[in-house]
């Protein structure tokens, strides 16, 4: 019987949701956040003509950018001309989640995971995976 209780407690701990965080928008109306590693940073904004976009940059081992619009699959850019990552003072702590508009993200020690409901990406030092 004790074994069953321990198994149930273990399953409950896996189902525990991440702590949700909110970030205040800048004077320009966009939201920026940076992972604790200072290797990944994101900007959420309403891009004129394209709608809502979440743009996340990874610095190392090679600079790249992922852009996820409110609809559709993410796009990965490996030749970024305006590399500007990771100056935000909003830290997206590990074990937390964030949601704004159609986007939701989770911060873990193994990287960043974001989606727009149908499509998304994971981003870390090892690479980027889109779906």
Protein language model annotation of sequence segments:
Residues 5-15:
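Bacterial N-terminal signal peptides
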Residues 16-20:
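Sec/Tat signal peptide C-region and signal peptidase I cleavage site
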Residues 28-44, 93-100, 104-106:
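Extracellular glycan-recognition/adhesion modules and their associated mucin-like linkers
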Residues 21-25, 49-94, 124-131:
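A low-complexity, Ser/Thr/Gly/Pro-enriched, surface-exposed linker/loop concept
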Residues 104-123:
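Short, exposed beta-strand-loop hairpins at the edges of beta-sheets
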Residues 44, 58, 87-88, 107, ...:
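Disulfide-rich extracellular modules and peptides
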Residues 14, 36, 50, 79-80, ...:
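Processing junctions and N-termini across compartments
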Residues 40, 54, 83-84, 103, ...:
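Extracellular secreted precursors and ectodomains with disulfide-bonded cysteine-rich loops/domains
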């Amino acid at each position: 019987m004790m074994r069953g209780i321990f198994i149930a407690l273990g399953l409950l701990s896996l189902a525990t949701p991440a702590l949700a965080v909110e970030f205040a928008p800048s004077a320009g109306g966009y939201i920026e956040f940076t992972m604790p590693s200072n290797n990944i940073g994101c900007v959420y904004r309403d891009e004129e003509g394209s709608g809502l976009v979440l743009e996340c940059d990874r610095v190392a081992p090679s600079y790249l950018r992922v852009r996820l619009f409110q609809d559709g699959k993410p796009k990965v850019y490996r030749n970024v001309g305006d590399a500007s990552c990771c100056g935000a003072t909003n830290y997206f702590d590990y074990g937390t989640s964030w949601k704004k508009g159609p986007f939701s993200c989770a911060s873990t020690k193994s990287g960043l995971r974001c989606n727009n409901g149908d499509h998304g990406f994971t981003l870390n030092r090892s690479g980027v995976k889109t779906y």
